């Protein structure tokens, strides 16, 4: 797998950690309230109680605490491209399994109940459409129950230059090639959407 644009993304976040330290600004989150809404939607995708979760692009692993408060008994694992992010995250949460790793480089037999990603696609550059699809496909390959991820949306009325905005309906279309059980949420922020792709129906 090519290191581009992953090396550049790692450098971007390493620099932000150097600038801001252990601070939400290092994660390029924007407003705390918008991040809380994103976490809330991700956490509502399924009943996580007792499940293993891989958080791809975990940053400071803030999502771990958010999940644990709402879903006791989860087994959280986090990976991130940025060594600086993981170093700070380990200092704050030494109890968690946190690694510097690229999703594509994990052992082929490493699986989790749910694979999650929050805000990892917007810096993918010109390769973004194809690479987003490859990343989600790899996430789905490694899940037992489902994957949940969010992205900036082309439905946003204002878009930041240089950031990737995905078309929600196009994303749903190729997610349906992975599974017929797909949920789209575009009701919590005007510029963001979340997709949950399950291996089987959530209804009895």
Named regions from a protein language model:
Residues 1-23:
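N-terminal, positively charged/glycine-rich alpha-helical extensions of SAM-dependent methyltransferases
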Residues 54, 60-105:
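Class I SAM-dependent methyltransferase SAM/SAH-binding core
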Residues 116:
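A conserved beta-strand element that flanks and buttresses the S-adenosyl-L-methionine
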Residues 124-136:
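A short, conserved alpha-helix within the catalytic core of class I
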Residues 163-179:
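Short alpha-helix
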Residues 186-204:
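Core SAM-dependent methyltransferase catalytic element
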